[in-house]
Amino acid sequence: MAQALPPLPYDYGSLEPHVDATTMNIHHTKHHQTYVNNLNAALDKFPELKDLGLVDLNKAVGTDKLPKDVATVIRNNGGGHYNHSFFWKVMTNPSNTNGPNGDVKAAIEASFGSVDEMKAKFNAAAAGRFGSGWAWLSVKPDGSLSIDSTPNQDNPLMTALPDVAGGIPLLGLDVWEHAYYLKYQNRRPEYIAAWWNVVNWEQVAENYKAAQAGTVPL
């Protein structure tokens, strides 16, 4: 089955003023679409890989399940497709975001001491990622939460890679320049701080519930 660009769960301007509509439009219809196109082109060369879903393709990165001819293409573009599909869902209109509560808040407090401390560590990971990449809040196999950053389009599902800590993602932030440069230019920390205003904590809670059941959210 061919991979497809998912529709956004909101309008391009819904995240204003924190993430601008022009950036969202270009990010979704150009950057994400390119990852989908490149991934499908790679899968066309190896039809047997089409039986793998997007999550399983990402989990296969760094293993011998992927032919060498397309391993890097799938790592970059399969990662890009998963990461962005996940990213769109963990954002929402600023009026709909109220902060974490319930089980996910308790898990954050158990792992980091407080929500504010978690945010501080997450901000540091996002701001400190040299070049392009992502910051992640993930559930580890022991049930604890951790914060990591990955380069380029790598993600916590790619556990076979030597520099990936692994886990099930709950929250992710794109810190590639194309995610923020039109509005924030080189002010990445300002973008990161603004982004918390559009985090969809209800979706994060759903992701946590899925992770507790061993399911990878997408």
From Swiss-Prot:
Q: Name one GO cellular component term.
A: mitochondrial matrix
Kindly state which keywords UniProt assigns to this record, in alphabetical order. Manganese, Metal-binding, Mitochondrion, Oxidoreductase, Transit peptide
Which E.C. number(s) belong to this protein?
A: 1.15.1.1
Indicate which residues the UniProt annotation says bind Mn(2+): H27, H84, D174, H178
Q: Which principal EC class is assigned to this enzyme?
A: oxidoreductase
Q: Where is the signal peptide?
A: none
Molecular function terms from GO:
metal ion binding; superoxide dismutase activity
Q: Does the keyword Phosphoprotein apply?
A: no
**Cofactor(s) needed by this chain:** Mn(2+)
Q: Name the family.
A: Belongs to the iron/manganese superoxide dismutase family.
Q: How does it assemble?
A: Homotetramer.
Could you tell me what this protein does? Destroys superoxide anion radicals which are normally produced within the cells and which are toxic to biological systems.
What's this protein's name? Answer: Superoxide dismutase [Mn], mitochondrial
Organism ancestry = Eukaryota, Viridiplantae, Chlorophyta, core chlorophytes, Chlorophyceae
